[in-house]
Amino acid sequence: MKKSTKYESTVKDAKTLESVIPKQLAEYTTRALSKLNEALGGDVGGYVANRLHMSHEELREALAAEQIDGVALAVYNIEKRGQSVVIGDQTGIGKGRQAAAMIRYGLLSGYLPIFFTDRYTLFCDMYRDCKALPVGGINLSWSI
């Protein structure tokens, strides 16, 4: 019996990580993404590009389709529901890149993003991910 299924992104013009999703989560994930896509008029990528102040090309260069979906869900939850989100992706799907996108979103939206980790070695990874999503005119400073 197959335990996972191919992830279907709402963003069709971005690179994909060829992710799979546990079969028991597929229906709920598809439903959530469909509702989001409908709420955003079918342009999830455009929504994220707008919120991150990036062109479509810059966005597609920095984030994969799965990551764009994750960032869209997070931003939408903040803006429309006043809620947070937990990124529960497996290793290698880009939780750090999504977190960096949310740091960028926070800085551009007047929030003070704070990154916590239990492993100091992850700060280098987060710095690299933030550099991949640069925020013009904002100096990334780090305290350890």
Residue spans for each PLM region:
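Intrinsically disordered, low-structural-confidence terminal and linker regions
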Residues: 1-32
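Phenylalanine-focused residue identity feature
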Residues: 7, 47, 76, 115-116, ...
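Generic, low-specificity signal for short hydrophobic/alpha-helical stretches with a mild N-terminal bias
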Residues: 18, 52-56, 108, 112
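Walker A/P-loop
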Residues: 82-102
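Conserved Walker A/P-loop ATP-binding site and its immediately adjacent core
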Residues: 95-98, 102-144
